[in-house]
Amino acid sequence: MSCNRFFLIGLLVLGSITSGAKPNFVIILSDDMGYSDIGCFGGEIQTPNLDSLAKDGLRFSQFYNAARCCPTRASLLSGLYQHQAGIGLMTGDKKLPGYQGELGRNILTIAEALGLAGYQNYMSGKWHVTKHTRPEGPKENWPRQRGFDRFYGTITGAGSFYDPATLCRDNTYITPANDSDYQPETYYYTDAISDNAVRFLKDHEMSDAEKPFFLYLAYTTAHWPMHALPRDIKKYQGMYDGGFDPIRKARLKKLKAMGLVSSDTKLSPGSDNWEKTPHKEWEIRNMETYAAMVDNMDQGIGRVIKELRNQDKFKDTLFLYLQDNGGCAEGYGRYAAKNGYREDQPMEPDELQKKIWPPMQTRDGRPLRVGPGEMAGPEDTFIGYGRGWANVSNTPFREYKHFAHEGGIATPLIAHWTKGIAKKMRGKIDHQPGHLIDLMATF
């Protein structure tokens, strides 16, 4: 079966575009989220905008990624398997074919291909397909050199949501403080990704409205650290007080009712026993914060949708939402800091944040707080939500990010395109397997 038959069947694209007009494309990629986190895939987290896209679009129940950040992005951007694209693992060079840790220069990215077809290409968010992350470069594998006309985001893969490492506008390192183009009252990276995407769309409408566009919206939600705004955390207070199992059972029941999994599907073995889990209040707060991060991302997706509706381009736009891997069981920040851990010095507001892994102090000199009892959410914390909640995120599957089990590689896929999906197909679920390499072939 050809690699694009999957979408030609599912989306019923042929014959749906009048007058040969080219559709716009929006790919939304979230980070370190599980199969059943969002509402339209069984989750209790409030994601009304993604749910709306699913209601009037298509859901794919057996779509697969590459289990890690970099390989998934390399495959998505190239339409190739990750080893063919040069990033079989992460961005370290293993001195082996397929493991160069760098997006191959002999491949055409989706943005480069669409540019040749007359598209304007925009990216907001996480890049993570090059080992060259320093401000001095080399930059031949940065977004602007791989087909994107404008870029706002981070070159590397993780960091504070209040002070992102490797933050750039186009080819220039910036900080939240010295970026004259974007000065919100409170800087939060997920909001910044959404807001800059909306700005790109506004500017496109003013200067290039006659051209189709491709927007790659690559969130770092919900990669550790668990950073979220208080107003979003408040929505989820009390929701997770019962621990892991009640949420897993409720999600599986909803997945079955929706028809996303078969009626005889069983839960995978639980990874942690809630009754024996210490620091329950801390664990609850970690998941409340995680849910708040996802909620905030959905709010931003809503702003993108609203802008396209205002421009009367929503119906002409194909939206695809998916995730880079499963929920993450890594234990980052879940243990108390050792002596000598906080060794960095405070930074000036406009001093470039070059450190890939987090500094041990905030810019204003507050020590970073990690370990049990340090409640997630604020800027001066740096905590992962842990194995127990990752098991919840990946309901009903076993294992996590990193693994080639369903818990590591199964992703929701939502496709929405008012002019391209027949009315009789809207709201339906497609159970045919698909993979990242199918996306570029479809475009």
Can you describe what each PLM-predicted range is?
Residues 2, 17-443:
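Formylglycine-dependent sulfatase
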Residues 6-15:
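Sec-dependent N-terminal signal peptides
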